[in-house]
Amino acid sequence: MNWSDILAEEKQKPYFKKILEFLANEALVGKTIFPTKANIFNAFKYTRLDNLKVVILGQDPYHNYNQAHGLAFSVQQGVDIPPSLRNIYKELERSITEFKIPEHGCLINWAKQGVFLLNTTLTVEAHKANSHKDIGWEIFTDAVIQKISNNKPNVVFMLWGSHARKKKNLIDTAKHLVLESSHPSPLSVYRGFDGCDHFVKANQYLTSKDLDIIDWRL
């Protein structure tokens, strides 16, 4: 089973075609959209469905130049590490002895190991956070979350912050592990994310299901 098997039907639906039309029209009038067209579906490119072990949900892509590249929380090489990702790194350093905070914010290495880094909205207009939140992406990403839940066993879902936690109803908690906390942003990191041990708990769960653990080092 691969992504095209479970998403082909979704991409034929009217709402999905409207998303693509909207993006094409925005480009025609000269608006800058992030990530670039080639990178919008990178989460699906780097994490194979048959290898998917962990889902980390983000909200919408970074909205400044050279940041977003289709993976939630991740930025391209050579770009400053954003505050939320810096706090994710601090939690990893606190909870995993061998983790050392890297000098970059590119999480492709996680994605290739089976960490699906999904933003619930896949595009954004330059410098306008949440500008594409109502164009239909959440219909698509809700379907993706539900299809992962239905078609895969033993997946770890990390839901950080109120927006991500609202997606819990799409997940069969009897067959998956759902880990919840506050968002790692500086505004809310101390309301539960700091000290959450999610990365340790994820690997403990994967081990209990005889699955390969994630090497969180970057």
Swiss-Prot record:
Active site as annotated: 60
Catalytic activity, as annotated: Hydrolyzes single-stranded DNA or mismatched double-stranded DNA and polynucleotides, releasing free uracil
One Gene Ontology CC term in the entry: cytoplasm
Assigned EC number: 3.2.2.27
Subcellular location per the Swiss-Prot or TrEMBL entry: Cytoplasm
Alphabetized InterPro entries for the sequence: UDG_fam1, Ura-DNA_Glyclase_AS, Uracil-DNA_glycosylase-like, Uracil-DNA_glycosylase-like_sf
GO molecular function: uracil DNA N-glycosylase activity
GO terms, biological process: base-excision repair, AP site formation via deaminated base removal
NCBIfam families recorded: PRK05254.1-1, PRK05254.1-2, PRK05254.1-4, PRK05254.1-5, ung
Role description: Excises uracil residues from the DNA which can arise as a result of misincorporation of dUMP residues by DNA polymerase or due to deamination of cytosine.
Protein name: Uracil-DNA glycosylase
Organism encoding this protein: Francisella philomiragia subsp. philomiragia (strain ATCC 25017 / CCUG 19701 / FSC 153 / O#319-036)
